[in-house]
């Protein structure tokens, strides 16, 4: 009996010591501005269209699918629970994709036994637009993703990401599991929020570009729109790119090449055809402006930029082979936010200084000569966007960039942030925090990788896209941009000096 009591006491002491060690590990020591001076380079790698649950919903210690309390059961247009998930819709008119079975009303594993679609396989694209995204969130209930999606039940799919290279990197450094995309909707608006924490303006936009809303400030549906999501995706009267009061919210093209709008036949080939209604050049202050005002070096590097410039300046009759062309890099012109701003117009010194090709980014890493702040946008085939890219290729590409930085002289004073512009229409169970008219919206993955990142850590601090701008602003003592959200963190919760 004495030995049993002794063993029990030793066990209790060991348990107490282990809890003390754990407690010490999570004691927060606020990061000081002096400590931040150790970070000389900030690298932001901006992937595409993945919700947190879609890639990291099974990550140990994260707020994942097993913790979901909201939106697990999706509801129909009338608010009643769906008997099953809608079919995965493809084509016009939409029909059920025969490669997917009928799925029960709950999240499902894309690479699991029911569906057998590993993350090396492309899936179809899903709607990810301003008004639809808000309707899917449904006031924080997160239960109308399937009903509003043009891809039906696909929205509820997720992967076991444990074999991803980035997953293994997240295990070594910090994964932020409450990082939210800056704005409702798609890539165009979220890239603008990365650049300026602002929504672009389009005064006097043509009526054909303006969204048609109902009395509840939702997209107006056509009379023939299916009453039930099981009968097909919703049909809208006019799913425009501009709000009725003149803000650009869905994909609009730049007035400058590379653009999805070719040059005018009789115009300057550096510009897009003004008669086809590109977004007027914007004048809001960007994070780039704030950096330049303090003489701090920065650049936006885009995969395929030089090829796209050549492609975009061709005569309008020439076939595009790079911009939105899947047989090459599939350059996405609306993923280039600084190209929408007047300060970076063709012919300006600042354009030449700050808008650069992705190959220069990779070469600069090898040379150990990156600017203080570097944004990197992978080319279309490597950005993980559903519909034209798989997860695996982008995962390997981004992990390779991290490895290259770690091998370079840059590593010892660099902070790398890997995140995604938006959720790509995929469901996530965590409601976004209260914000403003524009966002924030769904959770997206965010990894913080640095010698100064906490190791093996899941950061539950609420962040959004503007948190990156907030960190850059604090580190380099910049004038804050007005749209940066004060209630959200500045990423220093992921750091330890």
Which residues make up each language-model segment?
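Bacterial N-terminal signal peptides that target proteins for export
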Residues: 1-9
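Bacterial N-terminal signal peptides
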Residues: 9-20
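N-terminal pro-sequences and low-complexity stem/linker regions of secreted or lumenal proteins
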Residues: 22-497
